[in-house]
From Swiss-Prot:
It comes from the Eukaryota. GO terms for molecular function: phosphatase binding; RNA binding; ubiquitin protein ligase activity; zinc ion binding. A zinc finger (RING-type) spans 1144-1184. This is E3 ubiquitin-protein ligase DZIP3. Probably interacts with DAZL. Residues 1-22, 640-681, 1088-1141 are annotated as: Disordered. Residues 746-861, 906-941 form a coiled coil. Its main location: cytoplasm. The lineage of its organism: Eukaryota, Metazoa, Chordata, Craniata, Vertebrata. It catalyses: S-ubiquitinyl-[E2 ubiquitin-conjugating enzyme]-L-cysteine + [acceptor protein]-L-lysine = [E2 ubiquitin-conjugating enzyme]-L-cysteine + N(6)-ubiquitinyl-[acceptor protein]-L-lysine. E3 Ubiquitin ligase proteins mediate ubiquitination and subsequent proteasomal degradation of target proteins. E3 ubiquitin ligases accept ubiquitin from an E2 ubiquitin-conjugating enzyme in the form of a thioester and then directly transfers the ubiquitin to targeted substrates. Able to specifically bind RNA.
Length: 1204
């Protein structure tokens, strides 16, 4: 899309390029005070920007879109587009007096479109709920914007977006009109890729989608210009015509199956491997890659050579011309001419000059001995070929466009972008420039554009090494100047006279000069036209008219550059053909007329006059005798390198001319006498010649021809100073001389001939005086012009010197100010550096202190955790060892009793039970010690105590009475309220890593023995709490009623007081105590008072009824045993009452015979309550005795749960 040759959006009518409103930006330098005053006057709010117009400038195809798309574009501008950031930049630049940067860039537009598409895709709406037309419009704009940027990844993404549009249109039938936009966008993408054939096919598909409909949706917004298309179909036809012309215009390969047809032009691509160029008589140029030409020739013209195409019909379809030239290029800049056909009706070029001269000299000889007649009338173009092309014009255009133009653009660029600012901007826009210049132009004379933009060793980029194309690219990408009215990719209209438009036009002429003009040359008319346009551009850019005149007037030798300097200006190596052309000019080889006669100048003035712009007069030569062959030979000898025979003829001519010049310099009083003598001698000589030999006639004709040829040369050298009347006079002289040859030597004829000869000499003298006068006049004018130029140069130099002095003083002041600023900054930096060092030292010392503290605290924490675990271990082992000692004492006592009574089964069962308890306690001691030691070792290794699993404290041993009943094989009897319970004192769980007691019951430590696990009072959890998430709330009134039943001798108030004391002693709550535990605690509180009341009643009984003891002779003598039996009976009666009225401890509801279950330990529960408890816990909720369920051990007697 960056090619200047692509003009897809420009109409063929030149009036279309002109717009009614001219936007000419003039930057005037203003003083600082005036700028400050303007800053105060400018309002804070930026002026509104026409968003649609800015988008049209960036995306040119929008102007050709149908009317039905623009509502969606306006919706995008109103809802999803914002110019706030751009307007701030515009306001800032306008306040600073700089040129305003374009309000919209292609990158910013692509970013906005991406955000809008992302918002639509992020919504969770269905395809029927979103605005499909708006979504398709955004996809189309995004694809066209990516096509405008024309990167490789952008082309792939644009192709995907157009494919998404096609899929969405096929799914929703309401947006079929957008299908033409899909093919239109794909056609634009193909054009950007130089794939014009594919683009043409896509445009035709878009045209087919529209069909013959008259829908207003496809109309284009009306404009003032009547030549612009009014419908989208007309716009497509214009694109089709432009694409067809580009297929022929662009120098791309004409082979249809060429794989590289989508690449850049052949002449502009520096990586091609050779090409062929065919030109016909109608100036059609067709290009083929070298490989493609071989394939094409073998396919359609097998066995034919390249020279066989000479004279054949043009390969371009519809062209009636014939092939006249074929070029082959293997290396860039070196062209080989395979064949070239020269026709009589064509102009002679530099290449076919030799062939034309040979054709002229190969005329057949005639036997007629007739004196040749010379016709000095001007000739037409069709009779004798003349020179059409002059590469002198080419080099003058090369100098003014590439050398002078590049210098002017560099000067403007340096003023707007100094080297320091340029380096900063290049670093900012490095990502933007890298895809264009990082891998191109590897054969650049200075190493490539990327090497120039980003030189090594952190040097500043030098703009004096930038060529014109690179300067244009930097102006475009760095936003140095505003974009032209139609953007950077379109040819600016004639009404656009901005700097950016002129620079763009200058680059266009550069491309034309190095492609078309270099290959085909140009005429004088084309040279004058291009010179006028380029001069206007350079004058607007700031170049002086005197410098332009100097370039045009000076010869090539004075303005030529060497090979290396010209390579820097061109940006690429100078082609070989240009080098050969320059060498020819520098050696002094100039174009000559077709007659081949050498110009012999009388004075040095004639050479100077010829170098400026010598006109070429055209004459027709009628060849009718053998004398013409002699003339042609003389011409050939003079025009080419002189041989031995031609040297003599040239000397004779020079002697004749020297004699003639001497005669002209004689005084006027001797002219008549000399003319009479010469006339007499001439007449006598003619009589002798006519009488003796015919050869003398040839000599005379040669003499006359020499005079006439001198007259022709002099007239040509005098820039047409010899008028047509003078030529008629010469013609009359020749006719008179020829008439004299045919007379019979009469005296009248002799006199007539003498007068004519005298008239001829006088005319010649007149011309000599005219030449001298014009020479003096020209030299005087030249001196005056030189004086004026020198004065102008002196004035300009004085101005430059004054400007340089002012600038130097200003720069010196700036240098001093910068030095002071640098010094202040250095002082501030040193001060801050010292502060930073102090802060760094303080921070390092603080960090070191805190690290030491952290290490000390870590070691202390480790030691504390180890000590904590050791204390826990020793405390737990201490109580277990005390339990072990008590158990051993009990075992020794029971063993002693069993030894004294060997037949007692009760004592044997007691011995076995105490042995099992001792073994269980010892296993628990070993297990606890092992677990604590393992945790201590892990803490020492670095593990945190909070991350370690809690230590499981073993439960206390079961009750010995239960074990005795199990060993005896009897059903268990409910344990007494006054049975002592062996428990391990529990420790408070201070550390989160240790749990005091296990919630789940552990398996028995000895096989074959079922252990009961009475829960400690402080940590007992009610069974219902295990089944339910909330703790069991005991009904206060129900507990009081049951205590009244258990202790009938106590009043309700006394039982309430005892229960309140028990609640206070257990943390204001008895929710964790079972009913048996509550009864046991209350009995311990009632026992002291009961003993006191019994003593009082005993004393009263002994005194009141003394015969009471005698009535019972069988009573035991021990009061304690009696008391015990009475207690047992009382307990038995209370148990019977409790068996009838005791509730279920799980749900605290009354028991009924229908759903009653009794465990082996004689505790009763509801069947629906105890079964879930046993499935989860496996122990009795009251005594913690391990119970086997029938499902686990069907044959075991303890697994039966009898029902009452």
């Amino acid at each position: 899309m960056d090619s200047l040759a692509e003009e897809f959006f420009v109409s063929g009518n030149p009036d279309v390029e002109e717009q009614t409103k001219e936007e000419t930006e003039i930057i005037a330098e203003k003083p600082v005070t005036q700028l400050d005053k303007q800053k105060m006057d400018i309002s804070a709010d930026p002026e509104p920007v026409n968003a649609l117009l800015e988008i049209k400038k960036v995306l040119n195809p929008i102007s050709a879109l149908p009317k039905g798309v623009f509502p969606n574009i306006e919706k995008f501008i109103q809802e999803d587009f914002s110019f706030q950031t751009m307007q701030r930049e515009v306001t800032t630049h306008s306040q600073t007096g700089e040129e305003i940067v374009p309000a919209l860039t292609l990158h910013f537009l692509i970013t906005q479109l991406e955000m809008a598409l992302r918002n639509i895709q992020a919504s969770n709406y269905t395809a029927q709920q979103i605005n499909v037309g708006y979504y398709l419009t955004l996809l189309f704009l995004y694809g066209v914007a990516l096509t405008e940027r024309a990167k490789k990844e952008d082309c792939i993404e644009a192709e995907n977006k157009f494919l998404v549009m096609k899929m969405v249109i096929q799914e929703s039938e309401i947006c079929e009109n957008f299908m033409c936009l899909v093919y239109f966008g794909r056609g634009l993408l193909r054009c950007a890729q130089k794939r014009y054939n594919g683009a043409l096919l896509e445009f035709y598909k878009s045209l087919q989608e529209i069909g013959d409909t008259d829908d207003n949706w496809f109309e284009v917004d009306p404009t003032d210009d009547e030549d612009l298309p009014t419908t989208f179909k007309d716009s497509l036809n214009n694109f089709i015509k432009t694409t067809e012309s580009n297929i022929m215009k662009e120098t791309i390969c004409s082979y249809l199956d060429c794989e590289r047809s989508c690449e850049a032009d052949i002449l502009k691509n520096t990586n091609y491997k050779g090409f062929f160029q065919l030109m016909c008589s109608k100036s059609c140029c067709i290009y083929f890659h070298k490989i493609c030409w071989k394939k094409f020739k073998n396919l359609k013209y097998p066995g034919e050579s390249d020279q066989s195409f000479s004279g054949q019909k043009c390969l371009k379809e519809g062209c009636p011309g014939d092939m006249v030239r074929m070029l082959q290029c293997d290396v860039p800049g070196i062209v080989k001419i395979l064949f070239e056909v020269v026709r009589k009706d064509e102009y002679i070029t530099i290449e076919n000059l030799g062939a034309s001269y040979k054709n002229l000299m190969s005329l057949e000889l005639t036997d007629t001995d007739i004196r040749p007649k010379f016709n000095l009338k001007p000739n037409t173009k069709d009779e004798v070929p003349i020179f059409k092309l002059d590469y002198n014009y080419f080099y003058h255009l090369l100098h003014i466009i590439i050398i002078s133009g590049t210098d002017m653009v560099r000067q403007i660029f340096d003023e707007a972008m100094p080297p320091t600012l340029l380096k900063k901007e290049l670093l900012i826009h490095k990502n933007v420039l890298e895809p264009y210049y990082n891998h191109l132009w590897t054969n650049h004379p200075l190493g490539g554009s990327w090497h120039l933009l980003y030189p090594p060793n952190k040097e500043l980029p030098q703009s004096k090494q930038f060529d014109l194309c690179l300067l244009l690219a930097l102006i475009k990408h760095l936003n140095v100047f505003p974009a032209p009215r139609k953007g950077w990719d379109m040819e600016p209209p004639s009404s656009d006279l901005s700097k950016s438009a002129d620079i763009l036009r200058l680059c266009k002429y550069r491309d034309i000069l190095l492609s078309e003009i270099l290959m085909n040359g140009l005429t004088e008319l084309q040279f004058n036209s291009i010179w006028k346009k380029v001069s206007d551009i350079l004058l607007r850019l700031g170049m002086k008219q005197d410098d332009l005149d100097k370039v045009k007037e000076n010869p090539i030798e004075n303005i030529s550059l060497d090979y290396h300097q010209l390579s820097i200006y061109l940006g690429i190596p100078v082609p070989e053909i240009i080098q050969r052309m320059l060498s020819c000019y520098q050696q002094g080889i100039t174009l000559q007329s077709i007659t081949g006669s050498q110009r012999l100048d009388v004075e040095e003035f004639q050479n100077d006059e010829e170098d400026l712009s010598p006109p070429v007069m055209e004459y027709n030569i009628d060849v009718k005798s053998n004398t013409e062959i002699q003339l042609a030979e003389i011409n050939k000898d003079v025009a080419s390198i002189p041989s031995e025979s031609s040297t003599e003829s040239v000397k004779d001519l020079q002697e004749v001319k020297s004699k003639t010049k001497k005669k002209k310099r004689t005084k006027s009083n001797k002219k008549d006498k000399d003319s009479e003598d010469e006339q007499v001698s001439y007449m006598v000589e003619k009589d002798d010649q006519l009488e003796t030999e015919q050869v003398d006639v040839n000599t005379l004709s040669t003499y006359m021809k020499t005079d006439t040829s001198d007259a022709q040369e002099d007239s040509a050298a005098e820039d047409k100073f010899c008028s047509l009347d003078e030529l008629h006079i010469l013609d009359m002289v020749e006719q008179g001389s020829s008439g004299k040859e045919s007379t019979d030597f009469k005296e009248t004829e002799k006199e007539r001939l003498a007068h004519q000869h005298q008239l001829y000499k006088l005319q010649y003298e007149c011309e000599d005086y005219k030449r001298q006068l014009k020479t003096v006049t020209f030299r005087w004018q030249e001196n005056q012009m030189l004086i004026k130029k020198k004065e102008k140069i002196i004035v300009s130099l004085n101005q430059q010197v004054a400007f340089g002095i002012n600038k130097m003083s200003k720069l010196q002041r700036q240098i001093h100010a910068k030095d002071d600023e640098i010094k202040n900054l250095k002082d501030q930096l040193s001060l801050k550096r010292s502060q930073w060092e102090m802060e760094k030292h303080n921070l390092e010392s603080t960090v070191k202190t805190y690290l030491n503290k952290l290490n000390a605290e870590t070691s202390r924490a480790l030691t504390a955790e180890v000590y904590f675990l050791q204390c826990r271990r020793d405390f737990g082992l201490l109580h277990l060892e005390q339990t072990e000692k008590e158990c051993l004492n009990q075992l020794a006592r029971v063993t002693h009793m069993a030894a004294s009574n060997l037949e007692s089964l009760q004592l044997k069962a007691a011995v076995d039970s105490w042995n099992a308890i001792v073994a269980d306690v010892r296993n628990k001691i070993a297990f606890l010690r092992t677990q604590y030691n393992e945790q201590i070792n892990k803490v020492k290794q670095g593990f945190a105590l909070s991350t370690l699993p809690p230590v499981q404290l073993p439960p206390p041993p079961p009750s010995p009475e239960i074990l005795i009943q199990q060993f005896l094989g009897r059903p268990l009897v409910k344990e007494s309220f006054f049975r002592p319970i062996l428990t391990v004192p529990q420790m408070p769980a201070v550390c989160p890593g240790v749990i005091s007691a296990a919630v789940q019951p552990r398996p028995p430590l000895m096989p074959g023995i079922t252990w009961a696990m009475p829960t400690p009072i402080g940590d007992t959890v009610s069974p219902s709490a295990s089944l339910c998430s909330e703790p069991l709330m005991i009904n206060w009134e129900r507990i009081t009623d049951r205590l009244k039943t258990a202790f009938p001798q106590q009043t309700r108030k006394e039982l309430t007081d005892f229960l309140q004391q028990l609640k206070d002693s257990h943390g204001k709550s008895v929710s964790r105590l079972t009913f048996d535990e509550i009864v046991y605690k209350i009995s311990q509180m009632i026992e002291p008072k009961k003993s006191e009341s019994e003593e009082k009643s005993a004393q009263d009984g002994n005194n009141a009824s003394p015969s009471h003891t005698a009535s019972q002779p069988n009573a035991p003598q021990d009061p304690k045993s009696a008391q015990g039996s009475a207690t047992w009976e009382g307990d038995k009666d209370m148990d019977n009452e409790e068996e009838e009225e005791e509730p279920c401890v799980i749900c605290h509801e009354n028991l009924s015979p229908e759903n009653l279950s009794v465990l082996p330990c004689a505790h009763k529960f509801h069947s629906q309550c105890i079964r879930p408890w046993l499935m989860q816990q496996g122990t009795c909720p009251t005594c913690r005795l391990h119970v086997l369920q029938p499902e686990e051990f069907p044959g075991h007697p303890n697994g039966q749960l009898p029902k009452i």
